[in-house]
Design a protein with these regions (language model features):
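A short, N-terminal "cap"/entry segment at the start of jelly-roll beta-barrel domains
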Residues: 1-45
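A short beta-strand-loop-beta hairpin characteristic of the jelly-roll/cupin
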Residues: 60-89
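Conserved hydrophobic/aromatic beta-strand scaffold that supports enzyme active sites
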Residues: 48-50, 67, 92
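Ligand-binding loop in jelly-roll beta-barrel domains
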Residues: 88-89, 97-120
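Conserved short histidine dyad/triad with adjacent acidic residue
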Residues: 42-62, 96-97, 119
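Residue-level recognition of conserved beta-strand positions in structured domain cores
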Residues: 50, 62, 79, 105, ...
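Intrinsic-disorder/low-complexity, polar/charged segments enriched in Ser/Thr/Lys/Arg/Asp/Glu/Gln
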Residues: 33, 46-48, 100, 110
């Protein structure tokens, strides 16, 4: 394997996709999202890139575990019991597979993500 296999997030992403959460998941605002995928494993279980989110709130159901590092903005993550965690630039955390709740972007947000979804 060569040095060319190292993924440099400063380079253009291999794929960029803009999307909205499903209509029934949107609780407020217009939470459009843009995902720049810099790496995706051949087996489809590991992905890494940069995510950008516009203001709004939607329900989430993580089937994958995801490491996040907030680069810009402010978001509030709430669990199914209503307990919340505010994350902002500089925060680093991992959301485990199985987490259910809501994600609210309070100020336009950008994060680096690395997600892994183990498949049977």
């Amino acid at each position: 394997m060569s040095i060319m296999n190292i993924v440099d997030f400063a380079q253009p992403a291999k794929e960029s996709v803009e999307y909205m959460p499903k209509a029934e998941a949107v609780l407020s605002g217009n939470p459009s999202q843009l995902v720049h995928t810099h790496f995706s494993s051949p087996c489809g279980q590991l992905a890494a890139g940069v995510w950008e989110g516009a203001c709004g709130q939607w329900t989430v159901n993580f089937t994958e575990s995801e490491y996040c590092e907030i680069l810009e903005g402010v978001s509030v993550i709430r669990d199914a019991h209503g307990t919340s965690k505010t994350v902002r630039a500089g925060d680093r955390f991992l959301i485990p597979a199985g987490f259910k709740g809501t994600w609210e972007v309070v100020e336009p947000c950008k994060k680096i993500f690395v997600s892994v979804e183990f498949k049977a």
